[in-house]
């Protein structure tokens, strides 16, 4: 029995590893725009506000709208195939961002990225919850979510290097596409790995659902009744996490630009420093949060997971506020580091 359990957990951790790579890829494709504020604004002649619509609204609105219907498909269908299709979609749309010739074509490409990525987490969390015992879920989901910090960090580190290189060579002639600026080539390059990860998912087995689950479709009316009966708890949770995520993603998108505009960093230097913060402290925060929540839950604290989120948000607050007051680069980096650790 113990051998069977160990073998099952081995395949479960393999599943988490592949899903973490998918999450990493999704955040590279999602966050790479944070280093391209200047080049994109210059190419299209747009303001910071219109850039924010491209980086934020175009992605997040349709990411949110498509989350529920795609989650419904994940509940009733093959989650592995759903993720494979959606990874392919967002990867192609990321590459197409590099071919956009104006604000609206880039907006539509970002919408495609958001729609594709909307399926990943609902399906991934469902697969992980079926593959692991409850006492190990906190650590397993934290490892999966490490893709957020790895992806964001790699987006800034590699993006900074590419943009720094592109600034020295100007435009690049690509057969079939004509002259491309560095930021366009960056989008096309980062869109490729997702297609490879989609193929890797073909080696993963669909975890068995709990006995009886999925045999009879649950009517949407019952799902809505379940939510309505718990509207206070779910409403507070959704609103609270949404506000927290709004702050977190604001920092993630504008963090490098904050370093460039406030302290005079070059894009390459800002990307390397902010990317390192994301990878090291973001990953540490994720592992710490998951480990602490698992330990508290094992000791009988049923509210361990939302409690960790609450405490982390409160600890993050002074670092976020400090970003608007500090005047030295090292203090700015310290505030970004603290905010990143506790937000993870």
For each feature predicted by the language model, list its residue ranges.
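C-terminal transmembrane helical hairpin of 12-TM major facilitator-type secondary transporters
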Residues: 304-344
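Conserved MFS/SLC helix-loop-helix module at the cytosolic interface between two early adjacent transmembrane helices
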Residues: 65-101
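Cytoplasmic helix-loop-helix junction between adjacent transmembrane helices
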Residues: 109-148
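Helix-loop-helix hairpin linking two adjacent transmembrane segments in secondary transporters
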Residues: 144, 148-202
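Extracytoplasmic gate region of multi-pass secondary transporters
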Residues: 33-34, 232-286, 343-344
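Helix-breaking motifs and short loop linkers at transmembrane-helix boundaries and internal kinks
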Residues: 45, 78, 99-105, 133, ...
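Juxtamembrane intracellular "pre-TM" segments in multi-pass secondary transporters
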Residues: 2-9, 206-237, 262
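Extracellular/periplasmic helix-loop-helix junction of adjacent transmembrane segments
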Residues: 34-65
